[in-house]
Design a protein with these regions (language model features):
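Short, contiguous alpha-helical
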Residues: 6, 10-25, 32-74, 116-170, ...
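Helix-adjacent hinge/juxtasegments
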Residues: 67-107, 236-276
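Intrinsic disorder/low-complexity detector
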Residues: 173-174
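Carboxylate-rich helix-loop segments that flank metal/cofactor sites and access channels
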Residues: 104-116, 273-285
Length: 335
């Protein structure tokens, strides 16, 4: 079980609501044509991708309540941004109300639901709620890519920025919870690398637009974030991330990444509860001194990786390939 307390659920759900609101800010400026333009994403357009994020949150709330919907809301149900925002506000209130009274026993309660093709699945309430947030983060990354491809500028939804904005300030992370988060992150990153390993070099480095333009550079950024935070935990403050060309082929990048992942496994495996509540001080790329609670930095890193894996999926699909599925619940099924 990923979440063990109502406090932790409240933090993640409050972050998710904050991030969704920020995500929608630049969307308000797009034209009607851009709203529905098929740009080759997993769900075609901005409209389709936003509907999918909303629908994912809706269906997981229904399942956590013990229901088994047989279909998702569609673009026709949510034709405009105004309609989507109105329904989303009501949904977020419903999610908050559901989570507000959950006890540890209720978090651990298994829920069995029937999916859209008639197959039964069972997960705990805690894992369902974590997947709800993780799924939204993944597709917010895709929205950022689509906005840039439409010559728009997305807004940052980094987890640590949520704390800067006045979000929950009291950490409550257990070493076991963090170890499971990092096991998921490693599993997901390796699945992504395997899925792109056969992409030709010319496609791997082809500029298709997005936050980092190419698939190679997006993966290099994803790796670089893992690397730079590990450096910061070692007391160093690098002044830049590795460039895309330095990352090399997917096979070379995987070798480098496995070394970083081993470093994270050792660090997280040795965490004591009191360490998760300490501050990590470092200097960012601009030379500014910053500090955040260790536990929340680690959650930020995994959330950031999920976000950029969503971007990798969009670029992979736009290159005519099938992206890897990295849902948290899929990892549980494979365990």
């Amino acid at each position: 079980m990923m979440l063990r307390s109502r406090h932790e659920i409240s933090k993640l759900l409050a972050y998710n609501r904050w991030a969704n609101a920020r995500m929608l800010e630049p969307v308000a400026a797009v034209s009607a044509e851009e709203w529905d333009r098929d740009v080759g994403g997993s769900f075609g357009s901005l409209h389709g991708t936003l509907t999918h994020i909303y629908a994912g949150e809706w269906v997981w709330l229904e399942r956590a309540r013990g229901q088994s919907p047989r279909s998702l809301p569609t673009n026709e149900d949510l034709p405009t941004l105004e309609a989507l925002r109105g329904e989303w506000r009501s949904l977020e209130e419903g999610i908050s109300e559901f989570a507000r009274g959950l006890s540890p026993a209720e978090l651990a309660r298994p829920i069995t639901y029937t999916n859209f093709v008639g197959v039964n699945w069972t997960y705990t309430v805690a894992d369902i709620l974590f997947d709800l947030v993780n799924h939204s983060t993944y597709h917010r990354g895709q929205i950022a890519t689509l906005l840039r491809q439409l010559a728009r500028t997305p807004v940052s939804t980094d987890y640590v920025k949520f704390f800067d904005s006045g979000g929950f300030a009291q950490p409550d992370r257990t070493p076991g919870e963090l170890a499971r988060l990092f096991a998921y992150n490693r599993w997901a990153n390796m699945r992504v690398l395997r899925s792109v390993s056969e992409i030709p070099a010319e496609d791997y480095g082809r500029a298709v637009g997005g936050s980092f333009s190419t698939l190679r550079d997006t993966l290099a950024h994803l790796y670089g974030a893992d690397w730079v935070w590990l450096e910061r935990f070692a007391g160093r403050s690098p002044r830049a991330l590795p460039e895309g060309q330095q990352a090399g082929t997917p096979q070379v990048l995987e070798q480098k990444w496995r070394q970083v992942e081993e470093g994270w496994a050792a660090l997280v495996g040795e965490l004591e509860p009191e360490r998760t509540r300490e501050k990590l001080a470092y200097t960012n790329f601009k030379g500014d001194p910053l500090s955040y609670c260790v536990g929340e930095v680690l959650v930020h890193l995994v959330n950031n990786s999920t976000y950029h894996r969503g971007q990798v999926a969009t670029l992979t699909r736009q290159l005519g390939r099938k992206p890897a599925s990295t849902d948290y619940l899929m990892m549980l099924d494979e365990a």
